[in-house]
Swiss-Prot record:
Source organism of this protein record: Mus musculus
Full protein name: Neuroguidin
Subunit structure: Interacts with CPEB1 and EIF4E.
Cellular location(s): Nucleus; Nucleus, Nucleolus; Chromosome, Centromere; Cytoplasm
Modification N-acetylalanine occurs at: A2
Gene that specifies this protein: Ngdn
Pfam families membership: Sas10_Utp3 (PF04000)
Keywords: Acetylation, Cell projection, Centromere, Chromosome, Coiled coil, Cytoplasm, Nucleus, Phosphoprotein, Repressor, Translation regulation
Ranges of Acidic residues composition bias in the record: 144-155
Amino acid sequence: MAAPEVLESDVSSSITLLKNLQEQVMAVTAQIQALTTKVRAGTYSTEKGLSFLEVKDQLLLMYLMDLSHLILDKASGASLQGHPAVLRLVEIRTVLEKLRPLDQKLKYQIDKLVKTAVTGSLSENDPLRFKPHPSNMVSKLSSEDEEESEAEEGQSEASGKKSAKGSAKKYVPPRLVPVHYDETEAEREQKRLEKAKRRALSSSVIRELKEQYSDAPEEIRDARHPHVTRQSQEDQHRVNYEESMMVRLSVSKREKGLRRRASAMSSQLHSLTHFSDISALTGGTAHLDEDQNPVKKRKKLPKKGRKKKGFRRRW
């Protein structure tokens, strides 16, 4: 019962689509005929064209031909099962989809060439206008300088060698211009406050408060000191590298000193009664502890006038 109603509703829409299709076909046909006439007359030179565009046009033309053949068979009531046009349409559609990334890469160059051929010049906002030119890197001598250099070459062999060296100018890059350090005292104080806040958030007091009021399971470590933790991570990385590369790495004197210093810092007992400064989190002014800002030792300079005592040889 519903089939005749569906067919009647499809007839009106099909007639409208066929009229629109006929109008579009007539417009495209007129445009193609005009373009073909210009090409045959030699107005447009197609000898040095892109083979990629030619292949793409041929594929689109074959796709439209098979599609129109398929529409004709479907309109005549023939069965489309096993139709050879369907397989060709699938094959051409697959090739066109594979060509899409290549088309996107060549789109900018093709548009630029077409625009240059039409207008005869590049646009002002073209990014290739701002590319570096190697010719600008070579120092261009004036005609007077060239004449003077030629006159100096004719005087003597020595002067000729000097002028030859002077004529081949080398590119000298410009020196960096010193920039004024315009950081204000307020910005410097803000950076110092942010640094103090980061130090306070990573302090042992805040870490213990988090562990006390947090619902997460307690994390137990062998060594909680940051120096020991960092040293253990470096040792583990060294062991993994040696085991994977089958190579034994040597330890320098500096690394040995750092290990001894880290073990000494972790074994000190003065940190039992030491609490980190968290005044930066409460709105106060953070101050540096003595441990954070140690006093530098002065280097002992050799006194003048003293001579090294030599050893007497005993006979």
